[in-house]
Amino acid sequence: MAASINEELERCKDWIEAALEYSGGTHEWSDIVEGIHSLRYQFWPAEKGCAVTEIIMFPNKKIFHVFLAGGEMDQIVDMNDSAAQFAKAQGCDGMSIAGRKGWARVLKNEGWAESFTTLAKEL
């Protein structure tokens, strides 16, 4: 029997909360749960990891954006092809990831490349 979305969220909660530690305070656990339930975010659970994505509409492009990922790195990398297929099916022009620098090295062989650096400053 397939687990419900709530059961999967609870199973993945520690990974999501660990990833939220690097978000700069932009989201809390409750924001993620609400966003997944409202279909604003997409939830990608795996056996030993998970990711949370959103589709962002810019004036000239539609981007599939991975903004949270946690668990075993191999599990996250293994989602690349299915995530790309999903993004294409949604009419996305590209994919982006917000994460720590190590992701650039890990995903290089999957066709990813650094495109810019984001800096942050608390006010």
Annotate each PLM feature:
Residues 98, 113-123:
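Conserved catalytic-core motifs of GNAT/GCN5-like acyltransferases
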Residues 20-42:
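Active-site rim helix/loop that mediates acceptor-substrate recognition in acyltransferases
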Residues 45-49, 89-92, 113-115:
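Short glycine/proline-enriched coil/turn segments at helix->beta-strand junctions
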Residues 1-27:
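Short amphipathic alpha-helix that is part of the acyltransferase structural core
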Residues 41, 109-113:
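Short glycine-aromatic motifs
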Residues 37-74:
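Conserved donor-binding loop and adjoining core beta-sheet/short helix segment
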